Regions:
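Active-site histidine-anchored catalytic micro-motif
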Residues: 1-105
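Conformational coupling and interaction surfaces
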Residues: 74-78, 86, 90-171
């Protein structure tokens, strides 16, 4: 687990870490972009110190909380919009991309049991929000794997927008 400071704000910590990184910081974003967006708005020079963001979120063609919205983006669509308009390179590993890396329960158990032991049932419950038949789709795991080995997936460039006007397409 990461060390969480006892006081202060996440956006200040993001800024300090990025400014201190000699080659800039790559951010692995596993939930809503709220703290990163606040950091970008509070510290405009920060964007020059972030090499890129890998976002476990979004989707192409289907959603999990609404027909077209994925949870991480939906929970703070405005923050995601700030991130996407920041000029920082963003690599999105959404539901549709993570579905290609879906794992069976046995594969998950084999990978996770040495790490979490007796906590495995709870860990599986918390991690496996999405299922495709007997396979588990875990965007966070797919994003982390791609961060460690970009050759693990085929990528493409797209222009992405986030709907924030409260329509059915919100998020």
């Amino acid at each position: 687990y990461a060390h969480i400071p006892e006081n202060g704000y996440a956006w200040d910590l993001i800024c300090r870490k990025a400014m201190a990184a000699p080659d800039g910081l790559t951010v692995l974003l596993l939930g809503p972009a709220t703290n990163l967006a606040i950091a970008l708005l509070r510290y405009p020079a920060l964007r020059e110190h972030i090499r890129g963001v890998i976002l476990a979120g979004g989707s192409f063609g289907f959603g999990d909380v609404r027909p077209y919205a994925e949870r991480s983006v939906f929970e703070d669509a405005y923050a995601c919009k700030v991130l996407l308009r920041s000029g920082i390179p963003v690599s999105m590993i959404g539901l549709s991309a993570a579905a290609d890396a879906a794992l069976t329960r046995k594969e998950l158990e084999t990978a996770l049991r040495p790490l979490v032991g007796e906590e495995l049932p709870g860990c599986l419950r918390d991690l496996t929000v999405h299922r495709l038949g007997d396979r588990y789709v875990i965007p966070s795991l797919a994003a982390a794997a791609w961060m460690l080995d970009p050759a693990a997936a085929v990528t493409d460039h797209f222009h992405v927008e986030v709907e924030v006007d409260g329509t059915e397409m919100y998020g």
